[in-house]
From Swiss-Prot:
Keyword match Glycosyltransferase: no
Protein name: Cytoskeletal protein syp1
Gene this chain is encoded by: syp1
Domain of life (superkingdom): Eukaryota
Stored Gene3D superfamilies: Arfaptin homology (AH) domain/BAR domain
Annotated CDD domains: AP_Syp1_MHD, F-BAR_Syp1p_like
Biased amino acid composition, Basic and acidic residues: 259-273, 323-352
Chain intervals with Low complexity compositional bias: 240-251, 310-322, 459-476
Basic residues bias locations: 283-301
A GO BP annotation: actin cortical patch assembly
Modified residues (Phosphothreonine): 463
Length: 818
């Protein structure tokens, strides 16, 4: 307001330095502002009446739905009707906000920040600053002496008022006081205009939130038993059809999980079944058991088989060095690996997307699960060291089987005869060639699935010392089952770090999955029915980089990260931190030596991690001094923290959720609707989100045995959490539906369901963020005086073109258990 009043003082002296003419012009413009305000208020009242009618219709719809029988009510019809009503309300909301911005804010800003005669204003600003200094240094108390002095000068120079500039300078303080008196009325009217607009906008936002809560309250009374029953029927059909089909050969390596019915009927007796149940109970949440192949091998000689080879694996460097020193230890499996290295080009042709998927998934895990990755890496290292110390035995009464991975390449190195192996052993490549091959072939290190990874582990285990293989001999067929269980229990007690799931060597992938066909399918096509492993979809989005607008000169990219607890009242305990990236694009001109930038925000701000190489703090608050020559490539300038309040927290999160839970003794079922937030700042017909991760869990101490969900996602028995990954999606105003069912062990733990959001999006609208950047040319302008530069900064600041990225981390939604 202070800058606007100073502008009015300047505008009053423009026309022939006559205060009377300027006052008449000012009164005319003020009447026009009053008229525009009345028209806008009438227009908003009409639209609020229309929205009130829509709210009444929604209330009638809710009452009718409560009166009808829930079992006979058509769920899809009600959802379509609600979608139409919500879309209509959001359209009116967008029109009201746009009309307020175009009819009120923009004319006021254009009027009060215009400078038609810049040179005259600069001269007048210097005079006014001189008068202000005289008023401050004068010993006469206040304006009383200046009034007297001005009246005496007015009586002496009545004939030539506009002829002498010195006379006008002596008259300036009196005119200044007159403007102050008249300006009080203008300030009151302006304050009334702004308060009216702000109250109307707040009422509109509250109405929208009330309409949304009313419309969603309709579905809080709907039973979900029918939906879950229909979901269970569809999932059982999908599983029956999936088990009848054979796995495709074009997906690389495959492992056939389980035996056929005939083998199970003939190969397992009663004691074997009991032993298998005991072993599965013993190994639960401790270690992983490799799946069995349908075709058993004929080379079962009772010796340590694939389990000992799997658990006695060494690192790649130790296998290479031992192979160099002891060439007699090289057997057929290591030769197979070398053939696999030499023929890796065919594998890369068949699987071109393997490297991209691995790298992109690694990048996303670094951004979304930073805390989990460090713990998991330590656990994986502990697992490898513990496996080398004490291998685990094999179940008795089960024949030793070997995994026969299927390879879709033309010349498979695993199907060559022994003569080829012996011939290749004579032509062993050097260690340098093997290192080059291993670095150039990421498939050899990571594998396309569990089969490829397991084969690499076998090849590494060939050079282990014979003492490690004899340390825990495999049980014979006649060994007692209780003795075998006791042996395994002792081994597990000695190695408490053995985990049920281990990460792949050298990758940040979540967990191994048995089929790559499912990974290439759509994320929402099949439900997740896995209880022992995780099904993860592809992560096609690479590491996110800041986007800059296409403009010459200085441009910026601001990434804002929000967190808090989402509730019906908005975002509780909100917090916002962000990064500011800048870039200077020169259009064949020499960039200036320094530039000033002001960071503006409605909330208190603090800078952290300032880049001292290219940026310094400015002379005033929230200002930065930049060196454009060092910003020719994008660089992160600084980090910042915003201190938010819960009043404006509702407009920070672009998504909201409505959920309903049903809890039984052994299960918990959920139905949730994820929709765009109607009070968010940039709500349109649809909302584009670059990456969305939804995490659902029942509480801290609730152990979940299995989970079924639609759409499909990842479920971890270790953390008892369900994760849904969605990339590059457009969410309409009606939103989408999530179904989930958790099977739990009956316990006394209290279930407190929580849904967490992690959102990443890039907003291309003009003014979406909480922080804005303005150029400040007066920071390095030494020609004008200090008073003039302060006055000019009110209307000479220009906004820096900026692209905004929005990240939401750890935004929790707690279920209402009442």
């Amino acid at each position: 307001m202070e800058s606007l009043t100073k502008t009015e003082y300047v505008d009053a002296f423009l026309s022939n330095y006559s205060p009377n003419d300027s006052m008449s012009i000012f009164r005319q413009r003020l009447e026009q502002v009053r008229l525009d305000n009345d028209m806008l208020s009438q227009w908003i009242r009409e639209r609020m009446d229309i929205e009130r009618q829509y709210s009444d219709q929604l209330h009638k719809l809710a009452m009718n739905m409560q009166e009808k029988n829930n079992s006979s009510f058509a769920f899809n019809y009600a959802w379509k009707q609600l979608e139409g009503e919500t879309l209509e309300i959001s359209r009116y909301h967008s029109q009201i906000i746009g009309q307020i911005a175009s009819q009120v804010y923009k004319p006021l800003i254009d009027y009060y920040t215009s400078s038609p005669q810049t040179a005259t204003l600069r001269r007048l600003a210097e005079r006014l600053s001189t008068v202000a200094e005289e008023m401050a240094s004068s010993s006469v108390p206040g304006l009383k002496g200046l009034k007297k002095k001005g009246r005496d000068a007015d009586t002496k120079s009545q004939n030539d008022l506009t002829a002498s500039r010195a006379t006008w300078d002596s008259d300036a303080p009196l005119a200044f006081e007159k403007l102050q008196i008249v300006d009080e009325e203008r300030l009151l009217i302006l304050k009334q205009v702004y308060l009216t607009i702000a109250s109307l906008e707040t009422d509109t936002a509250l109405k929208q939130q009330e309409f949304f809560s009313k419309s969603m309250a309709v579905y809080s009374d709907l039973p979900i038993e029918g939906e879950i029953r229909q979901f269970m029927n569809s999932t059982s059909k999908v599983m029956s059809s999936a088990s009848a089909n054979k796995p495709s050969k074009s997906s690389g390596f495959h492992i056939n999980n389980g035996k056929s019915k005939e083998e199970k009927s003939h190969g397992e007796n009663e004691s074997g079944g009991k032993l298998k149940n005991k072993m599965s109970t013993l190994f639960r949440r401790k270690t992983i058991m490799p799946k069995k192949d349908k075709k058993p091998s004929h080379k079962s000689n009772g010796r340590p088989n694939k389990l000992t080879a799997f658990f006695n694996k060494n690192s790649k460097a130790s296998s290479i060095s031992s192979a160099e020193e002891h060439p007699s230890n090289i057997d057929d499996s290591s030769i197979e690996r070398r053939h696999y290295d030499s023929n890796h080009s065919s594998q890369i042709r068949d699987h071109p997307s393997t490297n991209n998927n691995a790298s992109s998934y690694q990048n996303f895990n670094e951004t979304s699960d930073e805390g989990e990755d460090n713990d998991a890496t330590i656990r994986a290292n502990n697992v490898r060291s513990s496996f080398l110390e004490a291998p685990l035995p094999v179940q008795p009464n089960v024949q030793a089987e070997t995994v026969t991975p299927k390879i879709s390449s033309k010349a498979s190195p695993f199907n060559k005869p022994n003569s080829v192996h012996s011939e290749a052993s004579r032509n062993t490549p050097s260690s340098i060639d093997r290192e080059n091959a291993s670095h150039s072939n990421p498939i050899m290190m990571h594998g396309n699935d569990f089969g490829g990874n397991f084969n690499n582990m076998q090849s590494r285990s060939t050079t282990t010392s014979p003492t490690s293989a004899v340390a825990s001999p495999a049980p014979t067929e006649n060994e007692d089952s209780n003795a075998a269980i006791e042996r395994v229990a002792n081994t597990l007690r000695k190695n408490p770090t053995i985990s049920r799931r281990t990460r792949r060597a050298g990758t940040m992938d979540r967990y191994a999955t048995a089929s790559s066909d499912y990974m290439e399918s759509n994320l929402g096509s099949l439900p997740n029915l896995s209880t022992l492993s995780l099904q993860s979809g592809p992560d096609s989005t690479a590491t996110w980089h800041p986007e800059f607008p296409n403009s010459s000169g200085l441009s910026a990219s601001i990434v804002e990260k929000y967190s808090g607890e989402l509730s019906e009242d908005g975002l509780l305990h909100p917090s916002c931190s962000g990064h500011i990236f800048m870039k200077y694009t020169s259009d064949f001109n020499t960039p200036p030596p320094e530039m000033g930038v002001r960071v503006a925000s409605e909330f208190p701000m603090s800078f952290t991690h300032l880049n001292d190489h290219a940026v310094k703090y400015g002379p005033s608050e929230n200002t930065l001094s930049l060196i454009p020559e060092l910003l020719l490539s994008p660089i992160k300038v600084t980090d910042f923290n915003l201190h938010l309040d819960s009043i404006n927290g509702a407009s920070c999160i672009p998504l909201t959720v409505v959920q309903k839970w049903k809890h039984d003794e052994s299960s918990s079922s959920m139905i949730a609707f994820v929709k765009p937030n109607p009070v968010w700042r940039n709500l349109g017909s649809s909302l584009h989100i670059e990456k969305l991760v939804i995490i659902v869990y029942l509480g801290e101490n609730v152990l979940v045995k299995s989970c079924q969900s639609s759409p499909a996602g990842e479920f971890s028995r270790k953390t008892s959490k369900l994760k849904l990954h969605l990339s590059n999606i457009n969410i309409s105003s009606s939103g989408f539906k999530i179904l989930a069912k958790f099977a739990i062990s009956p316990s006394a733990a209290i279930r407190k369901p929580v849904i967490e959001f992690r959102i990443r999006m890039v907003d291309s609208s003009n003014n979406p963020g909480l922080t804005k950047l303005f150029l400040k040319p007066d920071m390095f302008d030494t020609t004008s005086s200090s008073g003039g530069s302060q006055l000019e900064s009110a209307y000479e600041e220009t906004k820096v073109p900026t692209s905004y990225g929005i990240h939401v981390r750890e935004c929790s939604v707690f279920a209402d258990m009442s």
